[in-house]
């Protein structure tokens, strides 16, 4: 076990998000709009994706310098063939205490049991509306909520810890905030509202479309009073609340209205092996090239540590500054949310 590595602001490296694929079976307007990610879009070919051996090797190195939690993302990670085999390998690594997955839930019904048996502990399911007419417009594939809701139930039944994520955008699905809160309060499933963010350069973001945490709290609190809950750990992303008189949680991810850059402990690896230190990054460090040129573990580790030590990212603090406004940022579907 090497010494924990900290960045230039003293933030430790604790969480690793690994994108296993850049493809998705949805075309959500805020992430992979169909007019950009159309039939001719050049997704990564299989030979450019990190192999399971390469992912395991990197995860082991990250675990050795303080990473405890791994989250698998995409694209849609359940499109990656044999994903439970990767999870089993990651779950066996010394130092890794938590493995999660973010998914649109379409394939959860079929895969939940195998994922759980492989060592997956928790799953976050993206669902941006409870009413089909709204959800179908958002996902761009005319898919109803039914398979997603079935996937959520399947995940719970096999013993996975389940949370639901909802990106809220004014004029798109803000009408769904209360129906979603009602649905998942009744089911006892934590729901996390995510402020619409300017990730990437293709989702047409502007601040006027953001529904802030304070607005969401007022919308929900008028019907279901809520109170703040204590954070579980340093670097926790969601601001957690509980419905009064209940232990059911609701959370808010406030990248726009209340930056959490000062406590960000997350690194990201894209499906083709680039190492990013911020969700809003403009460039990454190519670890795949090192993996495929007989680079030693010590050499790889030195690169990883150096990148993190020199990390100065605080985009959400700088969002309104002129220098941040025209940055060409990496797309969320490529880097993982």
Swiss-Prot record:
[4Fe-4S] cluster 1 binds at residues 24, 28, 31. One of its GO terms (biological process) is Mo-molybdopterin cofactor biosynthetic process. Binds 2 [4Fe-4S] clusters. Binds 1 [4Fe-4S] cluster coordinated with 3 cysteines and an exchangeable S-adenosyl-L-methionine and 1 [4Fe-4S] cluster coordinated with 3 cysteines and the GTP-derived substrate. Pathway: Cofactor biosynthesis; molybdopterin biosynthesis. SMART domains: Elp3. S-adenosyl-L-methionine binds at residues 30, 75, 126, 197. InterPro entries: Aldolase_TIM, Elp3/MiaA/NifB-like_rSAM, MoaA, MoaA_NifB_PqqE_Fe-S-bd_CS, MoaA_twitch, MoCo_biosynth_MoaA/MoaC, rSAM. GTP binds at residues 17, 71, 102, 163, 266-268. One of its GO terms (molecular function) is 4 iron, 4 sulfur cluster binding. [4Fe-4S] cluster 2 binds at residues 261, 264, 278. Keywords: 4Fe-4S, GTP-binding, Iron, Iron-sulfur, Lyase, Metal-binding, Molybdenum cofactor biosynthesis, Nucleotide-binding, S-adenosyl-L-methionine. It catalyses: GTP + AH2 + S-adenosyl-L-methionine = (8S)-3',8-cyclo-7,8-dihydroguanosine 5'-triphosphate + 5'-deoxyadenosine + L-methionine + A + H(+). Residues 8-227 form the Radical SAM core domain. Its cofactor is [4Fe-4S] cluster. The keyword Nucleotide-binding applies. Disulfide bonds: none annotated. NCBIfam families: moaA. Catalyzes the cyclization of GTP to (8S)-3',8-cyclo-7,8-dihydroguanosine 5'-triphosphate. Belongs to the radical SAM superfamily. MoaA family. Monomer and homodimer. This is GTP 3',8-cyclase.
